[in-house]
Protein backbone atom coordinates (compact mmCIF):
# COMPACT_ATOMS: atom_id res chain seq x y z
CA UNK A 1 0.00 0.00 0.00
CA UNK A 2 1.39 3.39 -0.93
CA UNK A 3 2.13 6.12 1.64
CA UNK A 4 -0.45 8.34 -0.11
CA UNK A 5 -3.16 5.71 0.31
CA UNK A 6 -2.24 5.19 3.96
CA UNK A 7 -2.31 8.94 4.64
CA UNK A 8 -5.70 9.29 2.95
CA UNK A 9 -7.19 6.47 5.01
CA UNK A 10 -5.75 7.75 8.28
CA UNK A 11 -7.11 11.23 7.53
CA UNK A 12 -10.67 9.87 7.29
CA UNK A 13 -10.48 7.43 10.21
CA UNK A 14 -13.36 7.72 12.68
CA UNK A 15 -12.73 6.33 16.17
CA UNK A 16 -15.04 3.72 17.59
CA UNK A 17 -17.69 5.28 19.82
CA UNK A 18 -16.67 5.08 23.52
CA UNK A 19 -13.03 4.34 22.64
CA UNK A 20 -11.70 7.85 23.18
CA UNK A 21 -14.26 9.14 20.69
CA UNK A 22 -14.72 12.88 20.19
CA UNK A 23 -18.17 14.48 20.56
CA UNK A 24 -18.74 18.21 20.25
CA UNK A 25 -21.75 19.86 21.88
CA UNK A 26 -22.75 22.92 19.82
CA UNK A 27 -21.98 26.00 21.90
CA UNK A 28 -20.75 23.81 24.74
CA UNK A 29 -17.96 21.45 25.71
CA UNK A 30 -16.21 18.77 23.74
CA UNK A 31 -16.42 15.29 25.23
CA UNK A 32 -13.79 12.61 24.90
CA UNK A 33 -15.65 9.40 25.74
CA UNK A 34 -13.53 6.47 26.83
CA UNK A 35 -16.27 4.48 28.53
CA UNK A 36 -15.96 1.00 27.05
CA UNK A 37 -13.15 -0.31 29.27
CA UNK A 38 -10.92 1.06 31.99
CA UNK A 39 -8.09 -1.31 32.86
CA UNK A 40 -5.82 0.32 35.40
CA UNK A 41 -2.69 -0.08 33.28
CA UNK A 42 -4.20 2.02 30.46
CA UNK A 43 -5.40 5.07 32.42
CA UNK A 44 -2.43 7.23 31.51
CA UNK A 45 -3.10 6.95 27.76
CA UNK A 46 -6.33 9.02 27.74
CA UNK A 47 -4.79 11.41 30.26
CA UNK A 48 -1.92 12.03 27.85
CA UNK A 49 -4.50 12.79 25.17
CA UNK A 50 -6.15 15.29 27.49
CA UNK A 51 -2.76 16.84 28.25
CA UNK A 52 -2.10 17.31 24.52
CA UNK A 53 -5.29 19.22 23.67
CA UNK A 54 -5.71 22.96 23.88
CA UNK A 55 -8.85 24.03 25.71
CA UNK A 56 -10.13 26.84 27.93
CA UNK A 57 -10.58 24.23 30.66
CA UNK A 58 -9.92 20.50 30.98
CA UNK A 59 -11.96 18.21 33.20
CA UNK A 60 -11.50 14.51 33.87
CA UNK A 61 -14.38 12.31 35.01
CA UNK A 62 -13.53 8.85 36.35
CA UNK A 63 -16.03 6.13 37.08
CA UNK A 64 -14.77 2.61 37.68
CA UNK A 65 -11.32 1.16 37.10
CA UNK A 66 -10.86 -2.54 36.29
CA UNK A 67 -8.16 -5.17 35.92
CA UNK A 68 -5.77 -4.46 38.75
CA UNK A 69 -4.20 -6.46 41.53
CA UNK A 70 -4.00 -5.31 45.11
CA UNK A 71 -5.67 -2.56 47.06
CA UNK A 72 -8.33 -0.69 45.08
CA UNK A 73 -8.00 2.47 47.18
CA UNK A 74 -4.34 2.77 46.21
CA UNK A 75 -5.23 2.46 42.51
CA UNK A 76 -7.91 5.16 42.69
CA UNK A 77 -5.57 7.41 44.67
CA UNK A 78 -2.87 6.97 42.01
CA UNK A 79 -5.43 7.67 39.28
CA UNK A 80 -6.40 10.89 41.05
CA UNK A 81 -2.79 12.01 41.39
CA UNK A 82 -2.15 11.42 37.69
CA UNK A 83 -5.36 13.21 36.66
CA UNK A 84 -4.80 16.27 38.86
CA UNK A 85 -1.54 16.93 37.00
CA UNK A 86 -3.41 17.17 33.70
CA UNK A 87 -6.94 18.40 34.43
CA UNK A 88 -8.18 21.65 35.92
CA UNK A 89 -10.87 19.67 37.73
CA UNK A 90 -11.10 15.96 38.55
CA UNK A 91 -14.49 14.35 39.16
CA UNK A 92 -14.97 10.83 40.54
CA UNK A 93 -18.36 9.16 40.14
CA UNK A 94 -19.96 6.15 41.79
CA UNK A 95 -19.37 3.92 44.77
CA UNK A 96 -15.59 4.28 44.50
CA UNK A 97 -15.54 8.10 44.38
CA UNK A 98 -14.32 8.39 47.97
CA UNK A 99 -11.19 6.39 47.14
CA UNK A 100 -9.53 9.36 45.43
CA UNK A 101 -8.31 10.51 48.85
CA UNK A 102 -7.95 14.06 47.52
CA UNK A 103 -6.00 16.40 49.81
CA UNK A 104 -7.94 19.03 51.76
CA UNK A 105 -6.35 21.81 49.69
CA UNK A 106 -7.69 20.27 46.47
CA UNK A 107 -11.16 20.04 48.00
CA UNK A 108 -11.04 23.65 49.18
CA UNK A 109 -9.87 24.90 45.79
CA UNK A 110 -12.50 22.94 43.85
CA UNK A 111 -9.89 20.79 42.14
CA UNK A 112 -11.78 17.61 43.13
CA UNK A 113 -15.45 16.71 43.22
CA UNK A 114 -17.14 13.41 44.03
CA UNK A 115 -20.65 12.28 43.12
CA UNK A 116 -22.38 9.08 44.16
CA UNK A 117 -24.50 8.98 41.02
CA UNK A 118 -24.01 9.58 37.31
CA UNK A 119 -27.17 11.69 37.36
CA UNK A 120 -25.69 14.07 39.96
CA UNK A 121 -22.43 14.31 38.01
CA UNK A 122 -24.36 15.09 34.84
CA UNK A 123 -26.34 17.86 36.53
CA UNK A 124 -23.11 19.35 37.87
CA UNK A 125 -21.36 19.26 34.49
CA UNK A 126 -24.32 20.84 32.73
CA UNK A 127 -24.55 23.56 35.35
CA UNK A 128 -20.86 24.48 35.22
CA UNK A 129 -19.80 23.83 31.62
CA UNK A 130 -18.17 26.50 29.49
CA UNK A 131 -17.88 26.65 25.73
CA UNK A 132 -14.53 25.41 24.52
CA UNK A 133 -13.73 23.14 27.44
CA UNK A 134 -12.84 19.47 27.08
CA UNK A 135 -14.35 16.81 29.33
CA UNK A 136 -12.70 13.38 29.31
CA UNK A 137 -14.98 10.65 30.69
CA UNK A 138 -13.22 7.37 31.56
CA UNK A 139 -14.82 4.28 33.09
CA UNK A 140 -15.52 0.61 32.78
CA UNK A 141 -18.68 0.09 30.75
CA UNK A 142 -21.02 -0.91 33.59
CA UNK A 143 -21.34 2.68 34.86
CA UNK A 144 -22.48 3.98 31.44
CA UNK A 145 -20.72 7.35 31.71
CA UNK A 146 -21.70 8.02 28.09
CA UNK A 147 -24.91 9.37 29.64
CA UNK A 148 -22.94 12.51 30.58
CA UNK A 149 -22.94 13.36 26.87
CA UNK A 150 -26.37 11.94 26.05
CA UNK A 151 -28.01 14.01 28.80
CA UNK A 152 -26.73 17.28 27.39
CA UNK A 153 -30.13 17.97 25.82
CA UNK A 154 -31.97 16.50 28.83
CA UNK A 155 -32.82 13.28 27.03
CA UNK A 156 -31.63 10.80 29.68
CA UNK A 157 -34.30 9.37 31.95
CA UNK A 158 -32.57 6.08 32.82
CA UNK A 159 -30.31 6.74 35.80
CA UNK A 160 -29.34 3.63 37.78
CA UNK A 161 -25.60 3.65 38.32
CA UNK A 162 -25.41 0.06 37.13
CA UNK A 163 -28.35 -1.26 35.12
CA UNK A 164 -26.86 -4.67 34.33
CA UNK A 165 -26.93 -4.17 30.56
CA UNK A 166 -23.77 -5.04 28.68
CA UNK A 167 -24.88 -2.84 25.79
CA UNK A 168 -23.80 0.78 25.78
CA UNK A 169 -26.47 3.44 26.05
CA UNK A 170 -25.85 4.19 22.37
CA UNK A 171 -26.74 0.58 21.50
CA UNK A 172 -29.55 0.11 24.02
CA UNK A 173 -31.21 3.43 23.24
CA UNK A 174 -33.34 2.89 26.35
CA UNK A 175 -31.82 5.92 28.06
CA UNK A 176 -34.78 8.08 26.99
CA UNK A 177 -37.14 6.08 29.22
CA UNK A 178 -36.99 5.31 32.94
CA UNK A 179 -35.18 2.07 33.78
CA UNK A 180 -38.44 0.68 35.19
CA UNK A 181 -39.91 0.72 31.67
CA UNK A 182 -37.18 -1.26 29.93
CA UNK A 183 -35.08 -2.95 32.64
CA UNK A 184 -31.87 -2.38 30.69
CA UNK A 185 -32.94 -4.59 27.81
CA UNK A 186 -32.24 -3.11 24.37
CA UNK A 187 -35.38 -2.48 22.36
CA UNK A 188 -36.11 -4.14 19.06
CA UNK A 189 -35.77 -0.81 17.31
CA UNK A 190 -32.23 -0.26 18.54
CA UNK A 191 -30.42 2.27 16.41
CA UNK A 192 -26.86 3.51 16.30
CA UNK A 193 -26.62 7.06 17.58
CA UNK A 194 -23.92 9.34 18.85
CA UNK A 195 -21.44 8.95 16.05
CA UNK A 196 -18.21 10.73 16.84
CA UNK A 197 -17.82 14.19 15.40
CA UNK A 198 -14.71 15.95 14.26
Outline where the language-model segments fall.
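ATP-dependent carboxylate-amine ligase
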Residues: 1-198
Amino acid sequence: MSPTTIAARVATFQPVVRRLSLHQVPGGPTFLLDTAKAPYHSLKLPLETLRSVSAVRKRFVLGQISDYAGNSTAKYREAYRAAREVADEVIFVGATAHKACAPDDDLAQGKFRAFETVEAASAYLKGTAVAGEVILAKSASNLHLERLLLDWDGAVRCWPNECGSRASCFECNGYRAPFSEHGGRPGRTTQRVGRPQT
